């Protein structure tokens, strides 16, 4: 019976070789580590580990040895038997919940390191024949097919994730093998391979790669794209150089390289600081590749409709050449651009969270200049930034943006209330900037979700969930009330940063529901505020707002919510049911008794466009969690900044990097304020025939 997560790549009809018991296996490893040869004081501990692991690796030279061990154990266990087999060491641990041990003797926090034996599976070659593992193959390659169409593969259950092609004399590996992107462990050790194809970079889920005992001369740089890798064993090959691109393998625990004609610079680094030290050195020393092409601009209306703002063009980086003080036509007075950007707060940008980023590219001194180049280059009329701390707002953003003609508003998160002056300087929050040549501000305010006015409403019951889940979070939103100096049109801008943790989806929904309640109150108040601009200074006729729903509203920021989430559904549809799954069966009084709704006709600027597939790009997550929402009855989106070039992304594991200063990318949209249409006069033609 074969392992359901593990296949040897063949059907082996013969008797399986004997296997070591766990005690004998561990004893064999310890005997190598404690051998007199390794007690030489001139050998570093890191290199002793290399020698010990290389010796262990050489014991796995038989055809499909790891798969045979797993299959033999499964057969001996009988029906229903389940036991964990560690393919790296050949050892077994009893019980279905035992964790797989790495060759380092530690544990990986991933299910892929443990193989549970319950059912059988087979894998045929593309020719439809079965390889006989009793003799070594001499074919030029072994091609492996999925045996399923793309439509069927989506429904196919993957009962194995490990593949053992070790010790069978392979000379080449077919690129079809790398279509198995679900693989977590690949063993191609002790063959006759001379190269690893660059297509290996497609195995994004690979945790362990063993290509020891071959004649490989070079490591493909594409291996650096496999950020899930914990072990790469390349013992006994012909490798002399380790490509700097492997510096992105921030989770790599062991790079087995003993038995290679390695250049001294790499060998010395491993001897001194081990795999972690080598990877860090490679990461910081990796040459910076060419920058990506400029992000394009998507026009959503025709040129005949005067769609392009003086400050927006299809060559978006040319925005700095635009004259922001240039007189505008009447229709262009109604146009403006807005940016939303989570800039990644200085204290959040740590090597622990962003281990794939060079330390110099992670430093605030480097990133802040890139951020400011983006802000100046895109030249938006309104800019909403998240994760801006007090210190950098006061000393960097506010002064720099003032020189560019902006005025700013900043509020830190609620925790600042409990801190002294030194501590509060590093608390981040939301900052909104607007061009003083175009807007005047009526009012600014902050919504603190742990003490929002919505919590004091009589119909809101403060349940234990509200106290323990919502009011313990210190997220905020910043609202600014703006008036256009040229036409008197009003605009409400909400700059939001919603809670991040997916385990608190309910909190996200509650926060956004509170936000919409507050915006309704603010819009009602703003509608009745007197204008700050005398009528004789206006170039256009001042608009009127007979009801608060007529005022243009923009809600921008990092919502930490993708399309289809409760937050997205609530904003786009105008309501959320009391039993929505994102409430997570928690009691929030009125929210979970009758659901919640808002009266605004909100649309996502990027919602119906294919211009942007993600706003957050890291090895563990790629998705659109930042949004620009607008009131469709009063605003029309006329243009959008497109996403990052796909060819560039194919060689990037995540942001930030040398070209992108945050793990988020900025959103930029152009809007046009809709004008109330004057009713057509009634027809004076007399169609009555008498």
UniProtKB/Swiss-Prot annotation:
Q: Where does the sequence pass through the membrane?
A: none
Keyword Methyltransferase: yes or no?
A: no
Entry GO MF terms = metal ion binding; poly(A)-specific ribonuclease activity; RNA binding
Q: Where are the LRR repeats?
A: 157-180, 182-203, 205-226, 228-249, 251-272
InterPro entries per the record? CCR4/nocturin_mRNA_transcr, Endo/exonu/phosph_ase_sf, Endo/exonuclease/phosphatase, Leu-rich_rpt, Leu-rich_rpt_4, Leu-rich_rpt_typical-subtyp, LRR_dom_sf
Q: What is the catalytic activity of this protein?
A: Exonucleolytic cleavage of poly(A) to 5'-AMP
What does this protein need as cofactor?
A: Mg(2+)
Family matches, as CDD domains: Deadenylase_CCR4 (cd09097)
Listed binding positions for Mg(2+) are: 387
The superkingdom of the source organism is Eukaryota
- Pfam families tied to this protein: Exo_endo_phos, LRR_4
Q: Name one GO cellular component term.
A: nucleus
In the record, which residues are listed under signal peptide? Answer: none
Question: What broad class describes the main subcellular location of this protein?
Answer: cytoplasm
Report the subcellular localization.
Cytoplasm; Nucleus
List GO BP terms, alphabetically: nuclear-transcribed mRNA poly(A) tail shortening
Q: Explain the purpose of this protein.
A: Acts as a catalytic component of the CCR4-NOT core complex, which in the nucleus seems to be a general transcription factor, and in the cytoplasm the major mRNA deadenylase involved in mRNA turnover. Ccr4 has 3'-5' RNase activity with a strong preference for polyadenylated substrates and also low exonuclease activity towards single-stranded DNA. Participates in the shortening of poly(A)-tails.
| Family named by the database record | Belongs to the CCR4/nocturin family.
Q: What is this protein called?
A: CCR4-Not complex 3'-5'-exoribonuclease subunit Ccr4
* Source organism per UniProt: Schizosaccharomyces pombe (strain 972 / ATCC 24843) (Fission yeast)
Q: What is the lineage of its organism?
A: Eukaryota, Fungi, Dikarya, Ascomycota, Taphrinomycotina
| Gene this protein is translated from | ccr4
